[in-house]
Amino acid sequence: FDIETVKIMKNIADEYGILLKEHNCDYLNFNQISLRKKYGIDAINIAPELGVIQTNLIYTLSKYLKIDKEIEKFQKLVLKKNKWKKWNYNNENNFIKFLSAGHYHFNERLYKDIIFKINKKVDLQKMLNKNIENYLLRLFN
């Protein structure tokens, strides 16, 4: 995080009446986020981190609800598509690869079928909202 560069970029953004957003802010702690706010970053992108939260919740619920075959097929699909390479350079742990890349495949038919089966038994959206809320509360408190 280069404070001097951010100051210059913030001045330019303000001059044109636009907000300044930083990408790749996944897994920052409270102090790192506060520093960005202090120097004028208006928004941060943590979407991939939220994708990990959602993928983990889907995996956990699938195991709990005995949708094992489907989630294992989805996990294999995610690993096969290699999107995890963007996030995992030398990691050989397939579960971490799966968690980090699952969000790229939320539009797959297999994923939608899993969601349908989960929603028959629990309110997935409510659980996901609670998981994300808990994450944000931990981050900002």
Which residues fall in each region the model found?
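Alpha-helix-loop-beta-strand connector modules within alpha/beta enzyme cores
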Residues: 2-17
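Flexible, acidic glycine-rich loops studded with aromatic residues
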Residues: 14-141
